[in-house]
Design a protein with these regions (language model features):
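Pair of pore-lining "gating" transmembrane helices in MFS-fold secondary transporters
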Residues: 9-50
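Hydrophobic core of transmembrane alpha-helices in multi-pass small-molecule transporters
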Residues: 21, 116, 127-141
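Central cavity-lining transmembrane alpha-helices of secondary-active solute carriers
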Residues: 75-93
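Helix-breaking motifs and short loop linkers at transmembrane-helix boundaries and internal kinks
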Residues: 101, 122-127
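C-terminal ends and interior cores of transmembrane alpha-helices
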Residues: 111-124
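Glycine-rich segments within core transmembrane alpha-helices of 12-TM secondary carriers
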Residues: 163-181, 185
């Protein structure tokens, strides 16, 4: 591989790494924040007629009468919504990236994720948190597109290296996301 091609490949793999890393950090950063978030939303809008109030009543009806049980239930619901949407949208984003190009789809999904994270930071109501997780889950299909991009820019001999970059980004995202969320929850 010539030097300019290798340099372009390294730069592109670096961007793929950053894309996947930020996606996983965004997914996992909320995990340690669930107890504080849910406590806040239950206290501020936990009455009947609100989304969190209805979920709170359902959790108590199912025997989730402790904060821990409610946190596990709500955290599980939000994580499941995110993962389900990622599962549904991965093939959609993949097909679109085949037609429109990997870069365009990665740009769209990164912008969507950035918007959802920005809205999440300023979410004054629980339904906004749910909405941001829905949008983020839809955009998380970009991991499949990033993997395809890594395969596109590597030849058969280098493909393992390209897939390793994606795998390392996922692993480090799951390491740093909860740590950042934990630090934020204790601040």
């Amino acid at each position: 591989m010539s030097a300019p091609v290798a340099s372009t490949q390294r730069r592109t793999l670096g961007l793929i790494f950053l894309t996947v890393f930020m996606d996983i950090v965004g997914f996992s950063i909320i995990i340690p924040l669930f107890p504080h978030l849910l406590d806040h939303y239950i206290r501020t809008e936990g009455s009947a007629g609100t989304l969190i109030g209805s979920l709170n009543s359902a959790a108590e009806w199912m025997g989730g009468d402790t904060v821990f049980k409610k946190t596990v239930l709500f955290g599980g619901l939000l994580s499941t919504l995110y993962s389900l949407l990622q599962f549904v949208f991965s093939p959609i984003w993949g097909a679109l990236s085949d037609r429109l190009g990997r870069r365009r789809i990665l740009t769209i999904t990164l912008a969507g994720n950035a918007l959802s994270y920005l809205l999440w930071i300023f979410a004054a109501q629980f339904w906004v948190v749910v909405l941001t997780r829905l949008v983020s889950g839809m955009m998380a299909g970009n991991i499949a597109v990033a993997s395809a991009a890594a395969a596109d820019i590597t030849d058969e001999k280098e493909r393992t290296k390209g897939m390793a970059v994606v795998g390392i980004a996922i692993g480090l995202g799951f390491v740093f996301g909860p740590v950042i969320g934990g630090l934020a929850s204790s601040a």
